[in-house]
Amino acid sequence: MNLLVVGSGGREHAISKKLLASNNVEKVFCAPGNDGMRLDDIQLVAISETDKAGLIDFAKKAEIAFVIVGPEVPLLEGVVDALEEAGIKAFGPKANAALIEGSKDFAKQFMEKYAIPTAASRTFTDYAEAKAYLNERGVPIVIKADGLAAGKGVTVALEMEEAVLALKDMMLEEKFGDASLKVVIEDFLAGEEFSLMAFVNGEEVYPMSIAQDHKRAYEGDKGPNTGGMGAYSPVPHISEAVIEEAVQKILLPTAKGMVKEGRYFRGILYAGLILTADGPKVIEFNARFGDPETQVVLPRLESDFAALIDALLHNEKPDVRFKKTGLTLGVVLASAGYPEHYEKGNKLTGLNDIAEDVAIYHAGTKQDENGDFISDGGRVLLLAKEAETMSDARTLLYPEMQKLDNPNFFYRIDIGTKAE
């Protein structure tokens, strides 16, 4: 069968590559994809991820068996709705279900209604009221833009000055446009963070291997929040009992609650969780695969990925099996200055020297007229390595990262140290 993946990042590269490794899959197309995907025999289609008519037209012409929509923007713009209305099978939540990611305020109200553990919070549209609440609660405190901000709309403020500045940026300077006209202020939670993704079809939930993302730009979890600077899966210091508690108290009630609300969720539910003294609590929900978590979780999937998605689309029970031993480590190479101001068009060096057993997932790259790869985004690519232990993975992966050393790029050297 022929399949279509919508999106252009490292996540979509990982999804497409895993689909190609499935039985009965002839071709995988990616719209719009990126030039680096071609190296893995993924075929690019020059259609934007929100061009509904273009995607429908292509899916019909190329006899696409099903479409996987990767990023949050097309999900919230109703690309899955449009494909399904045109009679094309599409995996991902419809717009009304993707709202669990699209609005932090909606997610908070939903969690309160269904008693899903999360931090206490309040939502504001008035700057003066929000500032008064800040002063009343004190620091540390967390300030979130209500809408989509590419993973950068969250400030964990340890000082009041930082909290007020974040609030000003969002509400007065409109740093994230309409996304931050409404702001959620929530209590700071202390604990170990981890990502739990699951395949969801209505009330059916099939959890994946857990991962730990590294959101801050710099070593030691310092600097601004990013889309993610690296990840690994599984997370040895999070017990099976904690994962089971998260499934029972968070994922299942969420899936059931969404059905009850008339927001049937079929797709990937991503729970960004924190293990507190009172058990796991929700930091955020996403309505799709995480990036960079996908690049370290999907390589651990033992069952046939395309067959799994196909089963969910036909309301059948999927075969979901993950490796029980070893781990996968992934480190992001980012453009200097990311996540704030960075240049595009810088040449990547050392790519051809990367060991064959290290996976390269391209994100913000493209080829110039000479066929050389240049940067085309903040997060440029991710290298991933499977190994038996974290110290093996780090020992094997970081020399490969060093081959990419170049003043125009940077990466964190401490990804995975917590799991050693």
UniProtKB/Swiss-Prot annotation:
Q: Which UniProt keywords apply?
A: ATP-binding, Ligase, Magnesium, Manganese, Metal-binding, Nucleotide-binding, Purine biosynthesis
Look up the EC number in the record and give it: 6.3.4.13
Q: Which cofactor does it need?
A: Mg(2+); Mn(2+)
- Which pathway does UniProt place it in? Purine metabolism; IMP biosynthesis via de novo pathway; N(1)-(5-phospho-D-ribosyl)glycinamide from 5-phospho-alpha-D-ribose 1-diphosphate: step 2/2
What reaction is this protein's catalytic activity?
5-phospho-beta-D-ribosylamine + glycine + ATP = N(1)-(5-phospho-beta-D-ribosyl)glycinamide + ADP + phosphate + H(+)
Q: What is this protein called?
A: Phosphoribosylamine--glycine ligase
GO terms of biological process kind: 'de novo' IMP biosynthetic process; purine nucleobase biosynthetic process
Q: How is the cofactor bound?
A: Binds 1 Mg(2+) or Mn(2+) ion per subunit.
Question: Which residues are involved in binding Mg(2+)?
Answer: E284, N286
Keyword ATP-binding applies: yes
Name one molecular function that GO assigns to this entry. Answer: metal ion binding
Query: Where in the numbering of this chain does the ATP-grasp domain appear?
Result: 108-314
The answer on whether this UniProt entry bears the keyword GTP-binding reads no
Pfam families recorded for this chain? GARS_A, GARS_C, GARS_N
The family annotation for this protein states: Belongs to the GARS family.
Q: Which residues are listed for ATP binding in this entry?
A: 134-195
Which top EC class applies here? ligase
